[in-house]
Structures are given as C-alpha cells and as structure tokens.
Amino acid sequence: MAEYLASIFGTEKDKVNCSFYFKIGACRHGDRCSRLHNKPTFSQTIVLLNLYRNPQNTAQTADGSHCHVSDVEVQEHYDNFF
C-alpha cells in the first residue's frame, strides 16, 4: 500500500494532494481547491513577498486617512518600478 501511495503522489490519481500545486507551485482553483497544497521545504524559485507596494494601498495622510491616487499615477509608479 505504501508503495502504491508513493507512486501516485503528485499525480492526477492522488486524491489528497493537488497535482497542479505539486508540479508548478500554483493551483488554478486557488482557495476553492479541495486538495492539499503542500509547500516544499526548499525550492529553486525565490519568493519575494510584498515586493511591489501599490500606491493606492499605501498612500495615507498624516491623520491616517487614505489619499486618492489617480490611475495615471498608479500606472506611472508601476512602469517605473518594473
């Protein structure tokens, strides 16, 4: 039984682990996926979380309220970043 489970791990036949997430590190079903998304302990891919900060999410005044940032300013910020 253990050999069988090992042979189907990460394949379409595996009903517990998500084969999409196992192969490419992303799942087309997202949070709605019924299978497990096991994150590897090591990877050749570097993940840089929160690298780009959208000015619409971060622009605040001194009193803590959000500033309005135009779509043109957001696009310029994005273009300059990338």
UniProtKB/Swiss-Prot annotation:
Subcellular location: Nucleus; Nucleus speckle
Keyword Calcium on entry: no
Zinc finger boundaries on the chain: C3H1-type: 12-40
Residues with PTM N-acetylalanine: 2
GO molecular function (one): zinc ion binding
Cross-referenced PROSITE patterns: ZF_C3H1 (PS50103)
Any matching Pfam family: zf-CCCH
Any one GO BP annotation for this protein: mRNA splicing, via spliceosome
PANTHER family: U2 SNRNP AUXILIARY FACTOR, SMALL SUBUNIT
Family note: Belongs to the splicing factor SR family.
Function noted in UniProt: Plays a critical role in both constitutive and enhancer-dependent splicing by mediating protein-protein interactions and protein-RNA interactions required for accurate 3'-splice site selection. Recruits U2 snRNP to the branch point. Directly mediates interactions between U2AF2 and proteins bound to the enhancers and thus may function as a bridge between U2AF2 and the enhancer complex to recruit it to the adjacent intron.
Protein name, per record: Splicing factor U2AF 35 kDa subunit
Gene: U2AF1
